[in-house]
């Protein structure tokens, strides 16, 4: 792999201004030729300043805050589709002389994941339609009411041509899933059954994913699966839709 990660201990040795200077020294020792700031917050601005003073080319993301503020303000909203975050990241690299072709389709290329790897857990697909449902998100404002989502689960569970897979994690989400699985025996909870790699494999074999504005929307997008995304406190115009997802599939 040509990607490596360097952790920032922001509550320990990299805490505060003194800690940022320590982090800068550690990063500078790597002798980077360029610095691309995809975050553009106070800490990264300071680090970029230090690199710039050391004559290392730096480029930072432009987040388009003005357009987003007009989109979310209470009155006189301006509902204009903002540039996607993917395009903004590519713009940063282009500033440094590395133009990016945004032609990615799937981590599996034109194929899907190895079905034999997940079949012991999922069973054979046969002629069934496989629907993934990811009903939760990190922030409550993004979650469609659970009792209403259960109605969706019940609807598809009653269809003998459909198999529903529930995606989530954590104790509270598992309690909800366990309740649904008990009521609807054809529904399968995937919590604790697959790791991240094999869960992506399963997603590649879905016919569609129903998700909030959450990580699962983006994971399904990585394997080129259509996502019906439900937006609550956020808006698909803000530039955070899943990769190559269609606006017509947003709710």
Regions found by a protein language model. Give the residues of each.
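Catalytic machinery of carbohydrate-active enzymes
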Residues: 1-251
């Amino acid at each position: 792999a040509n990607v490596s990660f360097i952790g920032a201990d922001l509550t320990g040795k990299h805490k505060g201004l003194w800690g940022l200077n320590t982090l800068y020294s550690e990063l500078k020792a790597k002798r980077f030729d360029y610095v691309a700031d995809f975050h553009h917050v106070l800490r990264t601005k300071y680090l970029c300043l230090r690199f710039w003073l050391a004559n290392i080319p730096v480029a930072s993301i432009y987040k388009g805050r003005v357009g987003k503020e007009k989109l979310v303000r209470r009155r006189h909203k301006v509902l204009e589709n903002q540039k996607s975050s993917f395009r903004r990241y590519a713009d940063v690299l282009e500033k440094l002389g590395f133009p990016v072709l945004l032609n990615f389709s799937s981590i599996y290329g034109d194929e899907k994941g190895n079905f034999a790897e997940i079949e012991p857990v999922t069973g054979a697909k046969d002629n069934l339609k496989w629907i993934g449902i990811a009903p939760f998100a990190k922030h409550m404002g993004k979650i469609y009411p659970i009792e209403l989502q259960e109605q969706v689960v019940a609807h598809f569970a009653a269809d003998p041509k459909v198999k529903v897979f529930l995606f989530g994690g954590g104790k509270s989400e598992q309690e909800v899933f366990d309740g649904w699985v008990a009521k609807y025996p054809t529904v399968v909870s995937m919590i604790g059954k697959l790791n991240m790699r094999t869960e992506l494999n399963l997603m590649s074999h879905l016919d569609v994913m129903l998700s909030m504005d959450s990580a699962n929307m983006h994971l399904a997008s990585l394997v080129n699966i259509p996502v019906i995304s439900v937006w609550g406190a956020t808006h698909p115009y803000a530039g955070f839709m899943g990769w190559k997802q269609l606006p017509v599939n947003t709710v």
